[in-house]
Amino acid sequence: MASGKATGKTDAPAPVIKLGGPKPPKVGSSGNASWFQAIKAKKLNSPPLKFEGSGVPDNENLKTSQQHGYWRRQARFKPSKGGRKPVPDAWYFYYTGTGPAADLNWGDSQDGIVWVAAKGADTKSRSNQGTRDPDKFDQYPLRFSDGGPDGNFRWDFIPLNRGRSGKSTAASSAASSRAPSREGSRGRRSGAEDDLIARAAKIIQDQQKKGARITKAKADEMAHRRYCKRTIPPGYKVDQVFGPRTKGKEGNFGDDKMNEEGIKDGRVTAMLNLVPSSHACLFGSRVTPKLQPDGLHLKFEFTTVVSRNDPQFDNYVKICDQCVDGVGTRPKDDEPKPKSRSSSRPATRTSSPAPRQPRPKKEKKTKKQDDEVDKALTSDEERNNAQLEFDDEPKVINWGDSALGENEL
């Protein structure tokens, strides 16, 4: 069985699987990796994997009788000075009769193996699904229609429409399919206010991926419809749609960074959480009509109150301080910094799913140090770790108690 590397490949045409589309995997391959992404333990020495439902990942290409298999624990190690450091385990799913435990029958007891089966599955049968060749196919995103793992585990959220050329961001999933995403630690800025902005940006990116692609004509229509109904299309600046930013009068929200980035600036979506809906604006505002030579002017005065007990109160205050009458200014953390030896390197780590490689060691080593280096990762461990992020437990923000509720965005 091939290991998923260059060795073991043949000239036979690769099976065609659209892992970037909405369909789950249909056929096997010559590799020995799981078709699905890993579930990760939140802590070292975590309890055995348990599920709210059956524990079988959704795969509509299989009959109910074939929906059974096992989760296999994979120890993970992070390269560190003088050797390696253990990190929380990962668990991979394989169908019965495939993968590293292909010789086991369903239910056979073995350390690090958890057997799962959907209701109505024929656990006496063996699967012909095969396994994945990592050189040819991406991991397929995990989805559990009847409930995911318990609170001791999580997985990285990967959109179903991700293409092979676009590696997913490590947006950590909650421990259930009913709470699908929150920001991961790769590329995450410190502080609760940055988590708010990062989550807001993630929300709008996911909404754009789910919706239809916006054409140039559609974007132009969005930016030039009646002023009160305009929305900022992707790639547009704020002043292209709503005019130059000002101070002390209408159009005074937005600093230079927000104006340049438009809806890519996560603070936009964060503040939309406080903006009234059309109905709230009409029926909850003080409406003042005034006849002018050019027509009827309608003024809507609406007040949104953010409680000081709101978990995001300080974040909203910070954004308002930056953006109200913010023309000509930028956030302090966005100001250019002097180039240094480390900051002058290309910032590619946030887009890479691979673990950080250890720096080359200097030539001068003692014999003891040489022995410690020999205890570093084995080739098998490196291959397994190549699929994983060594990320910390994401910070949790209580969005349920925030200003207008978790469903307002």
UniProtKB/Swiss-Prot annotation:
Protein name stated in the entry: Nucleoprotein
One GO MF term attached to the UniProt entry: RNA binding
Pfam families according to UniProt: CoV_nucleocap
Annotated region described as Disordered, given as residue ranges: 1-32, 46-69, 120-193, 238-259, 327-409
Gene: N
Modified residues (Phosphothreonine): T378
InterPro entries according to UniProt: N_prot_C_CoV, N_prot_N_CoV, NCAP_gCoV, Nucleocap_CoV, Nucleocapsid_C, Nucleocapsid_N
Stretches with biased composition (Basic residues): 358-367
Record's subunit section: Homooligomer. Both monomeric and oligomeric forms interact with RNA. Interacts with protein M. Interacts with NSP3; this interaction serves to tether the genome to the newly translated replicase-transcriptase complex at a very early stage of infection.
Cellular component terms (Gene Ontology): host cell endoplasmic reticulum-Golgi intermediate compartment; host cell Golgi apparatus; ribonucleoprotein complex; viral nucleocapsid
Organism: Avian infectious bronchitis virus (strain KB8523) (IBV)
Domain of life of the native organism: Viruses
UniProt-annotated stretches for the region RNA-binding: 29-160
Alphabetized PROSITE patterns for the sequence: COV_N_CTD, COV_N_NTD
Biased composition (Basic and acidic residues): 180-192, 247-259, 368-384
Family the UniProt entry places it in: Belongs to the gammacoronavirus nucleocapsid protein family.
Region of interest (Dimerization), ranges: 226-333
Tagged with keyword Transcription regulation: yes
Biased composition (Low complexity): 15-31, 162-179, 341-354
Keyword Isomerase: no
Alphabetized UniProt keyword annotations: ADP-ribosylation, Disulfide bond, Host Golgi apparatus, Phosphoprotein, Ribonucleoprotein, RNA-binding, Transcription, Transcription regulation, Viral nucleoprotein, Virion
Cellular compartment(s): Virion; Host endoplasmic reticulum-Golgi intermediate compartment; Host Golgi apparatus
